[in-house]
């Protein structure tokens, strides 16, 4: 077989087989149910509201994301993605917005009387109608059932409004009650 004769892109060796037809390229991208969302919706429960994250949440959201004790159960370390870049004030909010813009995840701010107390995230699509879900509540609000309430509300929305086939949650054994 002959090489490409230094042609960039087109492999001339394909033409050496004397094909009847050279078809055009086709690009296929797998989509998810998040593709139908234009914006992060708002969800209400008896005590909580789940809403999009906003600029005013930066201090509380950053504190939640930087809480190493709480985040060891999260299964993700922001330092891996951050690398050598400096940590900016907007880093976590910008990442959440970028993930939604690319339809990789949807982050809900968990609010109690308007104040951000945690986060629920649908992420890691399996491209078969399922997503993983995670929830974290600020330590000063833990133990009051807010995590359970927020988690259930987001799962209900995902299954019955977004139309997912399944929502999967994982828990580190050490994090069991």
Task: For the regions a language model picked out, list residue spans one by one.
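Conserved acetyl-CoA-binding loop-helix of GNAT-fold acetyltransferases
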Residues: 1, 137, 143-160, 176
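Aromatic (often tryptophan-rich) hydrophobic motifs at membrane interfaces
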Residues: 1-30
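Conserved beta-strand-loop-alpha-helix junction that forms the acyl-donor binding cleft
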Residues: 2-9, 169-177
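Residues that form or flank phosphate/diphosphate-binding pockets in enzymes
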Residues: 9, 83, 128, 132, ...
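Residue-level detector of family-conserved "landmark" positions at structurally sensitive sites
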Residues: 24-25, 75, 151, 168-169
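GNAT-family acyltransferases
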Residues: 32-140, 156-157, 161, 167
């Amino acid at each position: 077989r002959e090489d490409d004769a230094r042609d960039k892109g087109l492999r001339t060796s394909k033409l050496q087989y004397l094909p009847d037809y050279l078809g055009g390229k086709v690009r296929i991208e797998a989509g998810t149910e998040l593709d139908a969302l234009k914006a992060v919706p708002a969800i209400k429960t008896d005590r909580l509201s789940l809403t999009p994250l906003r600029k005013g949440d930066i201090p509380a959201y950053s504190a939640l994301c930087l809480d190493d004790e709480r985040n060891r159960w999260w299964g993700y370390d922001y330092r891996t993605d951050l690398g050598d870049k400096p940590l900016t004030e907007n880093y976590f909010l910008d990442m959440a917005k970028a993930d939604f813009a690319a339809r990789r995840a949807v982050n809900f701010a968990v609010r109690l009387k308007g104040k951000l107390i945690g986060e629920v995230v649908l992420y890691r699509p399996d491209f078969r109608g399922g997503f993983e879900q995670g929830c974290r509540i600020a330590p000063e609000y833990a133990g009051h059932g807010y995590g359970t309430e927020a988690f259930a509300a987001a799962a209900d929305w995902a299954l019955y409004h977004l139309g997912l086939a399944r929502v999967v949650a994982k828990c580190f054994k050490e994090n069991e009650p």
